[in-house]
């Protein structure tokens, strides 16, 4: 079994009296490996649970909404990888607040060798600093159909993977209990 180390971020901002989180939609033709365990345009309109339900009702298939994350490069620290992945996949820069938790799961690669992979993803709560959501390179469009702001309160209902839903809940709990943010 192969081991993979990844890192990702729950990048948040406070705007108009609400907390918002940066999320990405995977391209419709991508087929991400779903975890086997229970432990995973420059102008964009914000997504809420109500608008997502309305939009997906008319779609052929429900979009896969997830948190920005990716492999930790050799010699790179998990936090640095999380900051890099958020920047590459969403177009925004952010600063660390706190490590939320690690998600651990096993999946089978759907490409190449079909190898079983034990994956650990370290997630960090990050605060938006600058940039424009969905301002990503053309090369990233293979991985990201679009990036958008989602109400943090709605995120656990909107995200596709159980572990990422848990990270959104932890982030929401943290911002609600830390008024200094």
Predicted regions mapped to residue ranges:
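N-terminal strand-loop-strand
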Residues: 1-67
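Short, charged/polar surface micro-motifs in flexible loops or helix N-caps
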Residues: 16-18, 28-31, 73-74, 104-106, ...
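Short aromatic/basic micro-patch
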Residues: 66, 118, 149
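The catalytic Nudix box helix
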Residues: 67-102
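Active-site segment of metal-dependent pyrophosphate-handling enzymes
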Residues: 91-132
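C-terminal alpha-helix
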Residues: 170-178
